[in-house]
Amino acid sequence: MEQTWMITCKVEFRSSVMFELDYEDTVLNLLQALPTNQTNPAKFIINSLTIPLAVQNAFQNKDFWRDPTGSKGEFHLVIKVILDGLENNENDWADSITCHWLDQRSGFYVMVDSTFVGHKLSGEIMCTVDEKICECIEKFANIIPNKYNYYHHTNYRFHIQRYRVNISIG
């Protein structure tokens, strides 16, 4: 069943080595540090879609003269999600999660406060997903269901099509 979601993700980084952090490593670390949602895998996956985009925004907003140890970023996304074999009973949510990890390159800790807001839209809504956004999500798309499958012994798959994300079992 196809659903249209408006999702907002805000991230706030804190680390004494912000200038050393690598974008791709940071996204992967954040995706791995994010706790999985046992009762609603669709919600976990939908939230995870915006992480690469919000982190990218935070990296673009780095200003070491103002704040050498932190950066903030956010991204708003309207996306069509096809839930094949999954159900998402929630129409609205707001989650706030703090994650931290040890950066392997620098040996320093990174802490990230993440806030997710999701709202199910009805009717014919224009999506905000373009080719550039699809490429950014697709780069990290494998780790999202892999992490969930590993922890919960399931077999979800992820297919990113133009303007849509297909989440299926099997």
UniProtKB/Swiss-Prot annotation:
It comes from the Viruses. Belongs to the tibrovirus protein U1 family. This is Protein U1. It comes from Tibrogargan virus (strain CS132) (TIBV). The lineage of its organism: Viruses, Riboviria, Orthornavirae, Negarnaviricota, Haploviricotina. The gene is U1.
